[in-house]
Amino acid sequence: MSIYDLIKKNIQSDGRLKKDFRILDEDVWKSNDDGQEDVQCLEYIDNMIEADIEGLLDIIFKIKDNNYDEIEKELEIYFENYRDTILIYREPLYKYFGKNKISISSLNNIYNFFKKMLTKSRNIFIIKISIIILNSLNLEYNIELLEIIKILALCSEFTLLGVLLIKTLKNIDINKEIYELAKKVYAWGKMACIFYLETNTNEIEDWILNESTEENILYNFGAITYSDKADIRKKLKKTSFKKNEFSKISFLIYSLLFLDTEKGITFLDYKEELLINYLELAKSIELSETDYLTIEEISSYMKDDIYYMEELGGEMRKDEYFFPLEISNKLLKECEEILNNRN
């Protein structure tokens, strides 16, 4: 059974796959979930090393309308031991097809073969390279191709590449397509959608905020992306909140403070405003355990920052401080005030 047919067979009545659906071989990709290898590269997707595509192009330009099986076998051999992200093929293939004049007959052969591979192949990397190559051809809107991509993209392993292709199509509502897909995928697939989703409505911002607590935000970049797209900075300027809304903001702030050695919050240019507004609101509303946990984390971080400034200040540059000393002391005092009044 092809991967496409496997995905299609497992689509539930709600249009989604089960959350535990997986196509990666656990014996080969033991520590990776579907989509992780590619989506975790989003942080530097526009500055990646580029694959040497000479060998791949040799295979591509052998394609004729009567040798699909032979070409598929060559591609299987080409990707047999491949374990890197497929994204390193994007730019060199985009550049090649964008700069070189290729005959109409060759382009037709390439298009027809790789479109066929989307629904026929049982090889993950052949499907991925097919999406990238089809994307490189600068296609006009094609409803049949779009429907195939939307089915493949339900699996997190293909979501990012599906979104990248959808983004290039013309005469469709791109953001609507990405939003609808985002609501059907999980984890790394959802992260891929949210990264490219334009949050041009309150509905989308609120949805992203709600989803942040449903998914495991596994690293800084994820926490930063969810926080920016949900626009928690803007939300903390409000005076009233929907049920659990403040706690969801707390969860994201906690994630920004807690994850990784290099805290995600340090990369925000509005971190001071964010924490000041958060703590000011926290003093005036009924708090949940999640809120208190976040405030404890802020307190801990401020204590560490104050220690480094007071004990090691002479050895540190000003830009190495999390906040100026007076701001850190102010935030710590507010944290202690809230925690001391805890019921």
Spans of model-derived segments:
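Long alpha-helical HEAT/HEAT-like repeat alpha-solenoid scaffolds in very large eukaryotic proteins
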Residues: 179-266
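Residues within HEAT/ARM-like alpha-solenoid scaffolds
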Residues: 121-125, 129, 153, 157, ...
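Eukaryotic alpha-helical solenoid repeat scaffolds
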Residues: 57-127, 131-135, 189, 202-223, ...
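Structural detector for internal amphipathic alpha-helices that build alpha-solenoid repeat scaffolds
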Residues: 91-101, 125-139, 159-170, 190-200, ...
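Flexible loop/turn segments at the boundaries of HEAT repeats in alpha-solenoid HEAT proteins
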Residues: 137-142, 172-178, 203-209, 219-220, ...
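Alpha-solenoid HEAT/Armadillo-like helical repeat scaffolds in large eukaryotic proteins
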Residues: 113-121, 145-155, 165, 177-185, ...
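Long internal repeat-built scaffold domains in very large eukaryotic proteins
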Residues: 2-74, 81-96, 106, 227-343
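Well-ordered, non-transmembrane segments within structured domains
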Residues: 96-161, 278, 331-338, 343
